[in-house]
Amino acid sequence: MPKRQDIHKILVIGSGPIIIGQAAEFDYSGTQACLALREEGYEVVLVNSNPATIMTDTEIADRVYIEPLTVEFVSQILRKELPDAILPTIGGQIGLNLAMKLSNTGILDELGIELLGTKLTAIDQAEDRELFKNLMQKLHEPVPESAIANNIEEAQQFADKIGFPVIIRPAFTMGGTGGGIANNEKELAEIAENGLNLSPVTQVLVERSIAGYKEVEFEVMRDAADSAIVVCNMENFDPVGVHTGDSMVFAPTQTLTDKEVQMLRDAALKIIRALKIEGGCNVQFALDRNSFKYYVIEVNPRVSRSSALASKATGYPIAKMAAKIAVGLHLDEIKNPVTKKTWAEFEPALDYVVTKLPRFPFDKFENGDRTLGTQMKATGEVMAIGRTLEESLLKAVRSLEVGLIHPERPAFAKLSDDELSKQIIQANDERLFYLAEAFRRDYTIEEVAELSKMNPFFLDKIKHIVELERELAAHKADLGLLAEVKRYGFADEEIAKLWGLHADQVRQMRKEQKILPVYKMVDTCAGEFASDTPYYYSTYESSTESVKSDKPSVLVIGSGPIRIGQGVEFDYATVHSVKAIQKAGYEAIIMNSNPETVSTDFSIADKLYFEPLTLEDVLNVIDLEQPEGVIVQFGGQTAINLAEPLANRGIKILGTSVEDLNRAEDRDLFDQVIKSLKLPQPEGGTATDKAGALAVADKIGYPVLVRPSYVLGGRAMEIVHDATELDNYIDRAVSVSHDHPVLIDHYLVGKECEVDCISDGDTVVLPGIMEHIERAGIHSGDSMAVYPPQTFSQDIIDQITDATIKLSRTLNCIGLMNVQFIIHDGKAYVIEVNPRASRTVPFLSKVTNIKLAQVATLAILGLSLKEQGFETGLLPNQSGIHVKSPVFSFSKLNHVDSLLGPEMKSTGEVMGSDTTLAKALYKAFEAAGMHLPQFGRALITVKDADKAEATALAKRFREVGYQLVATSGTAKAFEKAGITVSTIEKLDSGQETILEDIANRKIQLVINTMSADKKVSSDGFRIREAAIEHGVPLMTSLDTAGAILKVLELQAFSISPIKS
C-alpha cells in the first residue's frame, strides 16, 4: 500500500530527559523517525523537553517545541498546531504514557487526531499487566503464574499462595522502574509499595520467579499488510532476574539450537500479529536451559533500548522503518538504505558477534547498592563487534572506560576464596571481572556455573581468555601466539604487560610482522549482496573492506558511553562537528563505541568506525585513513585524554594545541596564566601527598574545595571543612588520578556562572552567559542555569567578558572553551577553564540560535570567525528567558545520597522557556517531573549555618499557604521569627515520625541541608532517601527552594483582610 495521503501534519513526541532506563537511544530513534517522515513529504512537528538532543535541532522537524512533556503543555501545542496524527512510539515509555493520557482526556477525539503505528488497544494490551496476561493465555503462549495487585495486601495474598521468591513488575513503567525480586514478606511490602507508587495506573504484576532461565530477546517488525520479520535476536549473559539493560548482551543468540530459535521466532511473530502492532516491537522470553519450556516475560510495543542496539548490531534502521510503516508503507515497498538493493522485508543476517556491555554510575556513587536485579541501574552502554565472541567481548571491555583494557581488576586478586565466591553468587556490576578472577585461581567451569548460575558456554569463553593470558606469560615474544591472541581481541597493552614490554613495542612488533587489523563492513546481509555502507569494525583477518578515500579527511573522536558527567551533550557536539567538516569539503570520519547515539548512525558521517576509544584502536584507524588531523574537543574527557598520547606519536591535533590544553588543565601552569593576566582567582595550591595537602589547606584556610586534576563531572570533588575531613578525603580519592596532583582551593561563597566561547586564535565570541541558581559548591552540571543572567550588573558582565577574552587569547584557544566564575564581593573570580566543548553547548546553541560546535569546527579548519560574520565580544541577548534544569535518577539507585555538592549526580537535563523567569522556572520544574502542589506541609530541616536564610524562605512558604514542619533546632529559629511551625522529633531521638509522615504522604515538600556532623548527616541521608523513595519533591539547596517559591508565588493570588 502506498503511503497515506489523508494525513499531512504529524506530531512526534520525544522522550524527555535522560534518566536511568531511558537514555540517548531515543534521541537516535526520534531523529531517524522525524527525518524519515519528512523524506516522505509529511510536515513534522516535534515536542520534547530535552535541549541536549539532535532531535530538537530546528532542521530535524518543520517546527520544534522544547516544552514539558505533560498533558497541559502538549494539549496546548495540539490546539495550536492541529496535527492530523501523533506518532507516540519513538518517545520511549514517556511518549507512550503521554499518548494514553491525552487520549483519556478526550482531546484526540475532540480535535480528530489519530495515533499512528501502534493503536491504543495494543499499547494497553502490552503495557497493562492483566490485559497482557489474558492475551497470552488466549494465544496459548506461556506466561509465569501471576496475579495483578492494586495494593500491598493483594500482592501479599498471591505471594503467600505460591511461595517466595516472587518478581514484582509495575505497569506502564520503563527500565524495570519500581520492580524487583522479593524473597520474603518484608521485601515484598517495600518493593510493592514502591512499584505501586511509580506505576501511573497504581498496578503491579506479582509473578512466580523464573530467575535462572536464559533471557532471550527478539526485535520484530510488522506492517499493515501483516508482513512480519525478525530483525535481530539477542541473548543475555545474565539469566532472568537481572534487567536486560544491566546485562551483557550478545547478538545473534549464542547458545540456542535452531529448534529453539525457530520456536521463539514463531512465538514473537505470533505476538506482534495478535497485538496488531504496526512498526517495531521487542519481545522478551525466558527459556529453560534443560528443556524446550519457555515463558513470555514482556513486550515493548515501541522502539526501545534494545531496538537501538539491534539497529546498530545489524545496520537495519528500525526507527526509520517503523516511522515509514506508521504512515502506511509496507515492508516490501521500503528500500533497505544499507544495501540500497534489497527491500526492508529481508531479514538481516550477521557474520560476526556483537557484545553490549552496560556502563554503571558507581564510580560516582561509591556507597550505592551494586546488586543487580529487575530494576535497571546502568546509565549507558557500549557495543563492540568481532569475529569471535572473545574478540567482541574484550573490545567491549576496553570500550567501557572504567580504567581497564582487560577483564582484570588487580584488587580482586587480594580477595579470599570465600569473598570471591560471594561476589560470584550475587549479580553485580563487576561480575565479569570476578568470574575471570575465579578462572585465574583454577576454579572449574562446573564450580563457577554452580555458583553463578551462568551458562557454561559463556564461562568457557571467559576461561579461554584466561588461558590465553597464561600462554602469553609463558611464551614471551612468540609471534605466532601474538597473531592468535590478536584474533581473540587482546589489546597491545595487555600483551605488553604480560611480556614486560611497552605497548608501543608490541605495536611495532605487530607492524613488522604484518599482524594488522582489517576493517569489515556492517551490511545487514552477511556479504550476500553488494553494499556501500560506510560502517566498519576491526578484526584480525586477511582482507579489508575499508579503503582510504582520495578526498582529504578529518577524524572526530566521539565520547563513548553515556555516564554521569559525560552525557548526550557531547554526542550532540560531535554530530555538529561532523556536519561542519562536511560543509568545509572534507570527508568526516567518526570513531565511537556507543550504540545509543546519533553519532553512530551510519548515515551521519562519511565513515563510521565502531571501535573502542583507546590509543591502540584510534592509531589503527589513523594508519589506514591518514586523516589531515584529529578533532578531540567535542568528545568530552574521553577524547581530550587521547590528545597528548596521539600528539606524542606525531598525529596532528586540530584546534587548541596539546601544550595549551595542558596549560588549562595543569594547576601550576594555569595559575601562572591567571597571575600573568592579573585575574582574580580563589587562593589555592597543589599537592601530591597528604602532608602537602594539609599544609596547603592550613595556609589558605578552611573550608577548601579539593579535587584531582584532569577530571570531568566533578569526579571525586569535595568541600572539606577541617583537617580530619581532608585526611579522610586524601585516603579515599588521591588515587583517582595517579599521574596528577590534587588541587586545593579556598571555597568562596557566591553566585556561580559559566560562559562558552568560540575563538579562532584572534576573534573571541561569547554567545551568552549562563547564571546558576544554586550558589558555588554545587557542580555546574547539577545547577539550574538561566540565560540571560537575571541578577548581574553590567560591571560583572563586563568583567566576565573581559576575563574570558583574555583567557582565550592567552591559552591560544582555537575552537570552543568553557569558563566558570564565582561572583564574590563584586568581583568575578575564575574557578575553572575547560578548553573544549562543555555540556552547556546544546542548551546555549538552542537559546542563541547559533550552532556553537559547527562555528567552532569551521574555525578549527581555518575559516575565521570574521569570515563567518562574528566580531570579538559578548553577543546581544536573545529574546525570552530560558532555564536549564538538571534531572536525577536517584529513585533507581539504592543507598545513594541525593545531597548535591561539587561532584555531579544528574543524568540528564530539561529546558523551560518563557517571557518571565517565574514562568520559565515553572516549565523547567514540570519538565523535570517535579510537580509542586500549591499548598500542603513542607518539612524543613537545615544545618545551623542555613537557619537565617531558611527562616526568610519559611515566611514566604507560609505566605503561599504551606504549613511548616521542622526539627527542634530549625523550629526554634522559625518561632523566634514569629513563624507558625509544628515541631517533629529528630530521628536520633529514636522516633521515626518524620519517615512515617513522608511515607504516608503527610509531607508534600522536603527541604533538607546537611551538617558536617556525621550523626546528623545520617539523619539527613535517611530523610532524603525517604523523600525519593516516596516521590516527595526534595530540595537540598536553599537556592533551589527559592526558585520554587518564585513559581508558587506566581501561581498564588494575594489574599489579605481589608484594613479597619
Curated annotation (Swiss-Prot):
Large subunit of the glutamine-dependent carbamoyl phosphate synthetase (CPSase). CPSase catalyzes the formation of carbamoyl phosphate from the ammonia moiety of glutamine, carbonate, and phosphate donated by ATP, constituting the first step of 2 biosynthetic pathways, one leading to arginine and/or urea and the other to pyrimidine nucleotides. GO terms for cellular component: cytoplasm. Residues 547-929 are annotated as: Carbamoyl phosphate synthetic domain. Residues 402-546 are annotated as: Oligomerization domain. Composed of two chains; the small (or glutamine) chain promotes the hydrolysis of glutamine to ammonia, which is used by the large (or ammonia) chain to synthesize carbamoyl phosphate. Tetramer of heterodimers (alpha,beta)4. This is Carbamoyl phosphate synthase large chain. Mn(2+) 3 binds at residues 820, 832. The gene is carB. NCBIfam families: CPSaseII_lrg, PRK05294.1, PRK12815.1. Mn(2+) 2 binds at residues 298, 300. GO terms for biological process: 'de novo' UMP biosynthetic process; glutamine metabolic process; L-arginine biosynthetic process. Belongs to the CarB family. The large subunit is composed of 2 ATP-grasp domains that are involved in binding the 2 ATP molecules needed for carbamoyl phosphate synthesis. The N-terminal ATP-grasp domain (referred to as the carboxyphosphate synthetic component) catalyzes the ATP-dependent phosphorylation of hydrogencarbonate to carboxyphosphate and the subsequent nucleophilic attack by ammonia to form a carbamate intermediate. Residues 930-1060 form the MGS-like domain. Pathway: Amino-acid biosynthesis; L-arginine biosynthesis; carbamoyl phosphate from bicarbonate: step 1/1; Pyrimidine metabolism; UMP biosynthesis via de novo pathway; (S)-dihydroorotate from bicarbonate: step 1/3. Its EC number is 6.3.4.16, 6.3.5.5. Keywords: Amino-acid biosynthesis, Arginine biosynthesis, ATP-binding, Ligase, Magnesium, Manganese, Metal-binding, Nucleotide-binding, Pyrimidine biosynthesis, Repeat. GO terms for molecular function: ATP binding; carbamoyl-phosphate synthase (ammonia) activity; carbamoyl-phosphate synthase (glutamine-hydrolyzing) activity; metal ion binding. It comes from the Bacteria. SMART domains: CPSase_L_D3, GARS_A, MGS. It catalyses: hydrogencarbonate + L-glutamine + 2 ATP + H2O = carbamoyl phosphate + L-glutamate + 2 ADP + phosphate + 2 H(+). Mn(2+) 1 binds at residues 284, 298.
